Amino acid sequence: GLELAKDKGFDYLTMKALADKLNVTPMAIYRHVSNKSDLINSVLDAFVCDVDVCNHEISNLDWKEWLRATYTNMYISLKNMPSLHPYLGNAPRFGPNAMEVLSKILSVLRTAGFNQQQTINATSSLTGFMIGCSIMDIAFHQSLSKSQQSSYIPSTIDSGLDHIFTALSLELEANNKAIAVS
C-alpha cells in the first residue's frame, strides 16, 4: 500500500488499486483491512516506520538537538509526500509506529524536566508547526528541481524551532525555579 501511495499518491490508494498492484482480488484485501479508512491508517503507519524520523540516539543529544533532528526529519518526510497531508488530521487512531515516535518525543521532553501538560503542549506545538510548514512549502518545493528539493530546508524552519525552543527553555527554567523554592 505504501509503495502505491508513494508512486501515485494517497488519492489513488483504493482497495481495487492495491489488489491490482498485488495481483489479488479486492476481497483478499478485505481480509486484512475492513475499509478504506483502515487501509489508509495502515499505510500512514507504514509511512511513519519507513521514514524513521527518530533514527538518532536520544542519549547522544540534548533535548533541543534531538527534537530539532526529529522534527527536521519529519518536515523533510512530509514535504516529500504531499499527498499525505489531507489525511494527517483525519486518522482516527495512531498505529504502533506513530505511537512509538510519539512515545520517544514525550520521553525526551519528560526527561528534560517538563511536566505532563507542558510535554503535551510542546509536542502539539512542534508537530503543528512542522506539519504547517511542510504544507505551506509544497507549492514552493514543486517549483524546485529534484536536487534542490533534497537539500532545501528553509531557514524559517530553523528560526521557528529556535523560537519554540527558547519559549520551552524559559518554561523549563521557571519549573526548576519553582521546584527550588518549594
Predicted regions and their residues:
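Alpha-helical structural segments
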Residues: 3, 7-8, 38-54, 65, ...
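Helix-turn-helix
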Residues: 3-38
